[in-house]
């Protein structure tokens, strides 16, 4: 399915080289102020820097066709369309499946009728519509003091400082919104860009790790067992092309700790509010928010489109062959994924709010 969510839902339509891509966001409360300049900013961030991004340069001019009136959401489905203006289909072969892409699985899923150009419906290009819609969900949350931010934690063997060192502050998260390359440490950013450039020159690509924080969530959001925050957010994050892993808080490192090391002890802050001394559980206990920042990390695989010669199979002849991918592709999709993760996370959190507080939570 190309639909995310239960009560606040996002449906994506379109193909990489089709005429347009569309997102329909349903279930968002009425009265949310829509900042089109904020949407434009996030779409610019998704386009990325020239070092890591694809040479395909789409203007990403968007049209809001429904669900917004006089600058505010109406409470009815929001339809956003972005037209494709810079597609080049000349480099794509219908029968040679590209290693690491969904070409092979799509061939069997859709019996050979799939649009293979640029990955079709599986392309990261579709995420532009996702970001436009998700930014409106972020608007709804920001009005309530809930801020989401993601930085590149690791790329090309170079690590940025984690949120944990200085705490996931709202100021840090807001700072990330102005970054086209979301890295706190300037020297780390410089070294990451060098690694990406080297991979591109070698005809190769890099994977990476992104770290996300949600600040301002109230206690009690989420459900036990199968409706927990981890599961709801992970469902959305795993829908993003290239995502191969998600961990919350200390994640897999918890498996190597003792209980005395892993447990987040409770204390009172200066305002007599209950907080935890550490945040190994990432702000979630029993699937429910505990009031601390929700922290999670996402693993992004290397861009599968590389210019090195690779072995494959020609599906029209069922013979082994070789393929060289000559299209315009990212050297590191992780560099552009931060804003996509923010957008998906915002939609998931809005869905969780609606489940707990009903459809008018943003205006009440």
Where do the model's predicted regions map?
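Internal helix-turn-beta structural module
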Residues: 9, 80, 305-364
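Glycine-rich, N-terminal phosphate-binding loop and its surrounding beta-alpha-beta segment
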Residues: 42-105
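N-terminal, positively charged regions that mediate nucleic acid binding
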Residues: 1-57
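Glycine-rich, mobile lid/loop segments that gate access to catalytic sites or pores
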Residues: 109-225
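Alpha-helical support elements that line or immediately flank enzyme active sites
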Residues: 19-31, 124-146, 150, 227-235, ...
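Glycine-rich anion/phosphate-binding loop at the beta-strand->alpha-helix junction
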Residues: 12-13, 19, 203-320
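A short glycine/serine-rich beta->alpha loop
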Residues: 9-14, 114-126, 219-223, 279-284, ...
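Short acidic, glycine/tyrosine-flanked loop/strand segments centered on an H-E-D-like triad
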Residues: 95-120, 311-329
